[in-house]
């Protein structure tokens, strides 16, 4: 169990590093965020099943629902930005520009 937790924490850390490194492109950032959410989902499900905390068994599913909503909104934003500007740079999302 300890090695599985360590692998999931490493996956989360690598996805977080990917967000920090590839923050100029929206698609790369969305993929790294999905990796973070997936590792959090698996880690929460494993911890809940290992400690038999069935009162909080809905928490991973709620996290998965929010992750799906985040992915949907992110992809809609990516499509809108790509059609308007022709690229997926995050700097195009600045709302202060006219």
From Swiss-Prot:
Q: Which gene encodes it?
A: MT-ND4L
**Assembly, per entry:** Core subunit of respiratory chain NADH dehydrogenase (Complex I) which is composed of 45 different subunits.
The answer to whether UniProt assigns keyword Ion transport to this entry is no
Coarse class of the protein's main subcellular location: mitochondrion
Q: Name one GO biological process term.
A: ATP synthesis coupled electron transport
Q: Which superkingdom is the protein from?
A: Eukaryota
Q: Which InterPro entries match?
A: NADH_UbQ_OxRdtase_chain4L/K (IPR001133), NUOK/Mnh_C1-like (IPR039428)
Report the EC number(s), separated by commas if there are several. Answer: 7.1.1.2
Q: Which PANTHER family match?
A: NADH-UBIQUINONE OXIDOREDUCTASE CHAIN 4L, NADH-UBIQUINONE OXIDOREDUCTASE SUBUNIT ND4L
- Main EC class of this protein? translocase
User: Where does it sit, as one GO cellular component term?
Assistant: mitochondrial inner membrane
In the bilayer, the protein is annotated as:
Multi-pass membrane protein
Its protein name is NADH-ubiquinone oxidoreductase chain 4L
